[in-house]
Amino acid sequence: MHLLVATAVSVERDAVARAFPAPGTEVSRPGITLHRLPDGWDLLAAGVGPARAAASTAAALTAAALDGRPYDLVVSAGIGGGFAPEAPVGSLVVADAITAADLGAETADGFLPVTDLGFGTVTHLPPAPLVRAAAEATGARPGTVLTGSTVTGTAARAALLRERHPGALAEAMEGFGVAEAAAAHGVPVLELRAVSNPVGPRDRAAWRIGEALAALTDAVGKLAPVLESWKPHER
């Protein structure tokens, strides 16, 4: 298996790397720097937000294809907000749907997703057998992970998202961008989030970033054997 794990920032990438005993090496490719681990794992701090994450992931996918060793799976991983009470701080969520929370248009009758306008997609579905296996291995709860360009900071916005996306368990800023790039290359995608804060009013004192990063490291350690043994045709 050749795997790409895309995080937003370097502290998340480093949390993933700590799940592996062997050190990695830095590999430069046009526009990106990969942290390459043994056994076919490449880690990428892809940047914050869906656009930057999509661009960086696409660059990594293209470089791998040109090198003659395309990726078999792309994983969007990191910390994120959790919708209480289903996804409390410190818990894990694995996406059974990766959804753009706000890609569409506002109308007098409410929000219309871009698909209702006749364009694109708003949801990518990771392989269901892989989602189940990941949930069993890590204890993560499967559910929708939303991607937005703006982090929720009010109770009103959190309630609106819950109304619009009833199956949502977590919110982050990169998963949909990573999934769009993977889909363009025909590569399956998975998203794993460790919950660092509740989705709702912005209260930095309530954030538990260190706890979430530790949970991410632990989860990746448990997930690695599942991913390494997974066959891409098992979709």
Curated annotation (Swiss-Prot):
Does the keyword Hydrolase belong to this entry? yes
Q: Which reaction does it catalyse?
A: futalosine + H2O = dehypoxanthine futalosine + hypoxanthine
One of the GO biological process terms: L-methionine salvage from S-adenosylmethionine
Q: Which InterPro entries match?
A: FL_hydrolase_MqnB (IPR019963), Nucleoside_phosphorylase_d (IPR000845), Nucleoside_phosphorylase_sf (IPR035994)
Superkingdom classification of source: Bacteria
Q: Describe the inactivation phenotype.
A: Mutants require menaquinone for their growth.
Provide the E.C. number(s) assigned to this enzyme.
3.2.2.26
Q: Which GO terms describe its molecular function?
A: adenosylhomocysteine nucleosidase activity; methylthioadenosine nucleosidase activity
Cystine connections: none
Taken from the record, one Pfam family name reads PNP_UDP_1
**Which regions form coiled coils?**
none
SUPFAM superfamilies xref list? Purine and uridine phosphorylases
Any one annotated GO CC term: cytosol
Give the matching Gene3D superfamilies: Nucleoside phosphorylase domain (3.40.50.1580)
Q: Which EC class does it fall in?
A: hydrolase
Q: In which pathway does it act?
A: Quinol/quinone metabolism; menaquinone biosynthesis
Keywords (A to Z) from UniProt: Hydrolase, Menaquinone biosynthesis
Mind telling me which CDD domains this protein's record contains? Answer: futalosine_nucleosidase_MqnB
- HAMAP family from the UniProt entry: MqnB
Chain's role: Catalyzes the hydrolysis of futalosine (FL) to dehypoxanthine futalosine (DHFL) and hypoxanthine, a step in the biosynthesis of menaquinone (MK, vitamin K2). Does not accept aminodeoxyfutalosine (AFL) as a substrate.
**Protein family membership:** Belongs to the PNP/UDP phosphorylase family. Futalosine hydrolase subfamily.
Q: What NCBIfam families does the record point to?
A: fut_nucase, PRK08236.1
Q: What is this protein called?
A: Futalosine hydrolase
